[in-house]
């Protein structure tokens, strides 16, 4: 099978190529050609501790003037002194944010104790406790980091987690929502200050490097070439009968990947890859053979409603179908909720309804996958690249618009956004495209700085001529919606929205900013022997 980046591919060929992938294709060797560290836009990958500005002495006013919250910044940094090093100010801002978040976490814990175990309010407050705890861990990890891109990703995740906490409380109809929101406001502002200090004071080389012909090339595939640490079979023929049991056996302190093989079968369980389960690699016998279907979680919060929830960093999933349970009600349930950093899905089928993929935070790659969904298909505030995949839009049960992406970037310095690259967007074959033509949009502005880029992709005639949507013109001045070299009946841009924030990219160097190399720094990930030929640049 020719690599996807070497030829034009039709929707039918793309589907065929994904399905014929072998049952347990585990790579045993890789030859890396032209692997060059990714270069992000301003504030991208680079050595944080080695940056010459780290020890520069600056005035506190000069630092805070470059943030969006001057008053909170001055209140937090002024005690350090009128002049100090960037390192000192950054440390103070981080510590101030952690202090505010610790107070909020304790408040969530105390308030949760006042509700019954099955109440949505208690679940939402417990979710907040977890999300704020994760935020504190992210902030504590920033100063030791060597990579500016990693630091920006961590602080961007903090902003996403804070918003997810508040969204959950609002969803639960928590009576003290306004009070909790006010209590979290200071930490939200200080997290933005931390991100601004990193972004404004640790710029990297912005020179656009074209690496379109540089990719990691696999030397060989070998079925069963790597012995899994854990094997799962529903029929009892393997060591474990459930995926949960295999994950519970995760050996903390393991060096390298923890490999789980999931034999063909339908697994009706909700899988959670916990924060402390890093480098988990899970593979199956194919998207139609190994299927995780989940169980009904209607009476829980959005944060908990997912068939597969991956939190531990560097999670990889290949050759598996993931879907929501058939009996899930009108409450949106994600097939995949992903907040694992440097995570990848390869040759997977993700089949859901509303909010099919909840890309909550951090950086992810979906490569050569099928994604089925309806209404709000992909949401969250991650830096997500969907590459060489097929997005199938299904008919809504009610006359509402299909929105393919709802990207939740709320701070202009976050390194997050959704990129659909070299992919195919079509209507479900069981529906006439005419039914969807006036109802399907590439994306919607849901936050002030929402960002979605669709490039080098095939767009079917289901796409509305305007292309993009907004609620009451919200965000149209500041979002980033862009297209580059798309094709197909839905790719015509002459009738697209006339917004200041919508762009048809014409310069190759501008498009390069959104490749897997530049946008999520995929060349630095440990994927050499797992997900097939990795194209990091443009396809044309």
Range-by-range predicted roles:
Residues 63-67, 74-77, 83-155, 159-162:
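Extended, amphipathic alpha-helical segments that serve as helical scaffolds
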Residues 105-112, 143-146, 166-173, 198, ...:
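Long, hydrophobic, amphipathic alpha-helical segments used as structural scaffolds
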Residues 2-3, 9, 13-21, 48-50, ...:
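Sequence-level preference for short, compositionally simple segments enriched
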Residues 15-17, 136, 140-188, 192:
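Amphipathic alpha-helical hairpins/coiled-coils and adjacent low-complexity
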Residues 74, 147-169, 365, 449-463:
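Hydrophobic/aromatic-rich, well-ordered segments within soluble, folded domains that form packed cores
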Residues 103-107, 142, 161-172, 429-431, ...:
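Extended, well-ordered alpha-helical segments in internal regulatory regions
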Residues 3-4, 12-80:
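Terminal alpha-helical segments
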């Amino acid at each position: 099978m020719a690599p996807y980046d070497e030829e034009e591919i039709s929707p039918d060929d793309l589907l065929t190529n994904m399905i014929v992938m072998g049952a347990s294709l585990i790579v045993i060797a890789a030859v890396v050609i032209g692997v060059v560290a990714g270069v992000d836009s301003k504030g991208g990958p680079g050595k944080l501790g080695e940056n010459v500005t780290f020890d520069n002495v600056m005035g506190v006013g000069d630092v805070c003037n470059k943030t969006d919250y001057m008053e909170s910044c001055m209140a937090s940094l002024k005690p350090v002194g009128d002049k100090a090093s960037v390192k000192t100010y950054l440390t103070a801002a981080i510590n101030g944010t952690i202090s505010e978040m610790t107070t909020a976490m304790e408040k969530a814990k105390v308030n949760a104790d006042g509700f019954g175990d099955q109440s949505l309010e208690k679940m939402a407050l417990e979710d907040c406790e977890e999300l704020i705890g994760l935020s504190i861990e992210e902030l504590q990890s920033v100063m030791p980091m060597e990579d500016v891109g990693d630091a920006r990703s961590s602080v961007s995740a903090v902003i996403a987690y804070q918003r997810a906490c508040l969204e959950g409380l609002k969803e639960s109809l928590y009576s003290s929502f306004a009070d909790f929101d006010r209590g979290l406001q200071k930490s939200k502002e200080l997290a933005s200050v931390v991100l601004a200090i990193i972004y404004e004071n640790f710029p990297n080389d912005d020179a656009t490097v074209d690496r379109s012909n540089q990719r990691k090339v696999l030397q060989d595939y070998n079925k069963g070439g790597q012995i899994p640490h854990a094997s799962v079979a529903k029929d009892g023929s393997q060591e474990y009968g459930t995926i949960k049991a295999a994950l519970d056996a995760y050996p903390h302190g393991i060096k390298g990947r923890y490999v789980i093989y999931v034999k063909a079968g339908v697994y009706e369980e909700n899988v959670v890859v916990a924060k402390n389960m890093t480098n988990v690699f899970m593979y199956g016998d194919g998207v139609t053979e190994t299927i995780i279907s989940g169980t009904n979680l209607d009476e829980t919060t959005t944060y908990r409603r997912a068939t597969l929830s991956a939190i531990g960093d560097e999670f990889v999933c290949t050759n598996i179908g993931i879907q929501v349970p058939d009996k899930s009600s009108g409450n949106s349930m994600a097939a995949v909720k992903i907040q694992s950093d440097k995570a990848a899905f390869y040759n997977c089928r993700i089949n859901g309804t509303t909010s099919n993929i909840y890309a909550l935070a951090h950086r992810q790659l979906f490569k050569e996958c099928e994604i089925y969904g309806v209404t709000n298909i992909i949401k969250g505030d991650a830096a997500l690249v969907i590459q060489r995949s097929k997005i199938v839009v299904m008919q809504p049960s009610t006359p509402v618009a299909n929105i393919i992406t709802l990207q939740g970037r709320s701070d202009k310095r976050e390194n997050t956004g959704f990129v659909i690259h070299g992919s195919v967007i079509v209507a479900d074959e069981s529906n006439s495209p005419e039914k969807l033509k006036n109802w399907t949009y590439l994306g919607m502005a849901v936050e002030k700085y929402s960002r979605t880029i669709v490039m080098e992709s095939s767009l079917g005639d289901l796409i509305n001529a305007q292309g993009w949507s907004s609620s009451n013109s919200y965000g149209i001045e500041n979002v980033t919606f862009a297209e580059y070299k798309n094709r197909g009946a839905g790719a015509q841009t002459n009738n697209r929205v006339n917004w200041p924030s919508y762009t048809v990219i014409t310069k190759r160097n501008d498009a390069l900013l959104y490749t897997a190399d530049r946008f999520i720094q995929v060349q630095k990930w440990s994927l050499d022997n797992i997900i097939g030929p990795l194209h990091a640049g443009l396809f044309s």
